[in-house]
Amino acid sequence: QAHGAEYKGRRAGSMGDMGCFSFYPGKNLGAAGEGGMVTTANPEFARTIRMLRDWGAEKKYHHVLKGYNFRLEGIQGAVLRVKLRHLEKWTEARRAAAKRYDHLLIGSGVGLPKQMDYSRHVYHIYAIRTPHRQAWMDALGAQDIQSGIHYPIPVHLLPAFADLGYQAGQFPHAERAANEVLSLPMFPELT
């Protein structure tokens, strides 16, 4: 969801040992179905990733790892190739919509996304923070404006991570964010 984002002059996906991108249809660069990409400059990591995505096979019928079927279908690649040509235009439209939101919401008492001088936000989501989230949702809904709650449960409280033994109250900032974050509509065609 950070396709085209930058931090101190470096693009997302080029920092660290590996980068990961989702091509879920709702993302800034979305396929027609499921898909994703891993980036790396490390040849050994790239070799391992290629094997893991193809049932662990180094070459056909020669499986050296326990892998999965994570190959991107050709039609998905074709869709992405066409959409990639438009990504920068769509990103700038999202950034313009975010500026409009900033202008309209400044002074409203809600927390706004921050755009630092040394980074480039691509606004997959435009999320505000407010302790009055339900009131905002109701007011927006009354105007036929959709809003959404992304990630309503902090990771440490998800059943999948119960074995780690974390309890409510141990990560108060994450818990507060889960209760306050509200996503406003964000897409390139937003007017």
Task: Kindly give the residue locations of the regions a language model identified.
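Conserved PLP phosphate-binding loop immediately N-terminal to the Schiff-base lysine helix
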Residues: 1-22, 29, 154
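Short, hinge-like loop/turn segments at secondary-structure boundaries
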Residues: 11-15, 38, 165-168
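Acidic, glycine-centered active-site loop in nucleotide-sugar glycosyltransferases
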Residues: 15, 34, 126
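PLP-dependent aminotransferase class I/II
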Residues: 6, 41-191
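Glycine-rich phosphate-binding loop of ATP-grasp-fold ATP-dependent ligases
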Residues: 28, 32-37
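Residue-level recognition of the GNAT/N-acetyltransferase active site
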Residues: 24-26, 187
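Histidine-centered beta-alpha loop that forms part of the nucleotide-sugar donor binding/catalytic region
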Residues: 1, 24, 34, 50-54, ...
